[in-house]
Amino acid sequence: MNYRFTNILKVIIFFCFIFEIQSEEIQKPYKNLEKALLNPADVRNLDLSFLGLKTLTNKIGQLKNLQKLDLGGNEPTILSKEIWQLKDLQKLNLNNNKLTVLPKEIGQLQNLQELSLHSNELVNLPKEIGQFKNLQKLNLDNNKLTVLPKEIGQLQNLQELSLLSNKLISLPTEIEQLKSLKNLDLNHNELTTVSKEVMLLETLENLDLRSNKLKTIPKEIRQLKSLKVLMLTGNQLTSLPKEIEQLQNLKTLNLGENRFQIFPVEILELKNLLELNLYYNQLVEFPKEVGQLKSLKYLSLYHNQITTLPVEVTQLPDLQELHLSGNKITILPKEILQLKNLEWLSLSNNKLNALPKEIGQLKKLQRLELGNNQLTTLPKEIEQLKNLQRLELDSNPISPKEKERIRKLLPKCEIDFEGGGGE
């Protein structure tokens, strides 16, 4: 009985394998239009990317069942009108072309779910873009857009809107109507304020506002209850609104390259925060209350003006990476070495002249950056770091004899005495 059952099982597995291979063959994209036209009714996926095409034959309109079309990396300054007759099209890629205008006929693609237009030369969008009732992803990165049409608000099923590297100075009020939006990327634009309408996007999980000209964040940010990632790097912020502490689902907060002189204490209420970046600011103190962020795994404060570390940092039991390079730290408190889960510790470009022997307690440490300090020796306990893969000690006054001693203490570790790789 077991033998027969085993044979039957083998037969079932065999046919499943054959079926999977056939399915993969059906989904495999055609790379040649002429070959695709031999069996036009069977073609679902056509990839004509990076072929140097400047025109497109009107025969493409024969592919009535086409669902995915990739025309990226060509130079069709005028798109074939037959494309707009492909009513079953779900995914359209027009990246890396030289398009300056998007024809209004594009609105005829009622079944479109993904539209990618990044790296073109578009200065505006036709109002017909609002006709994409099924559109879920819209990528407009690297264009020359200064405004968005108000019809953008009609994209009720849109989940991802990417507008990186454009010239937007504001957003239409209708953007608040995007009730399904989860990801909004406005990185590298010309925004001086965040419109309150953005703060009404209750489903938003990822908001990227890096490299704009923001000086303040509106208190209405408290309404983004679903927000998990907030990127504010490269702006002109000096403070945060108290209301930000209501974002209890926030996992990642990036505030690097701003103008903070005082640690924004509002952050301390974000109990579920996993990653906090405050690099390249003007902070002089590291608040002892940071120990309240019990879930924190990644903390980056490199290139500030911090002189001392509070012992309360040991209250971050899950911390895996601590980046403090480019500060003015003179002493590393032995308590900090109780961070049992620490894997990466960066202390380059400080004023350390010694390490506590407790360094050996960091059993999970894989990378230790100590370049450009005033160290002349390391404690013997460094040999206890069995998982250490890289140690950076460049630009320290360490003698050749001491270097040889350190190498013997860590025979399996890559040790850099010359420089090349720290923050």
Predicted features and spans:
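N-terminal capping/linker segments that flank leucine-rich repeat
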Residues: 1-67, 395-423
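Periodic short-repeat tracts
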Residues: 91, 101, 110-114, 134-137, ...
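The feature encodes a structural signal of leucine-rich repeats
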Residues: 34, 56-59, 79-82, 102-104, ...
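Aromatic (phenylalanine/tyrosine) cluster motif
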Residues: 3-5, 14-19, 132, 260-263, ...
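Leucine-rich repeat
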Residues: 40, 62-66, 84-89, 107-111, ...
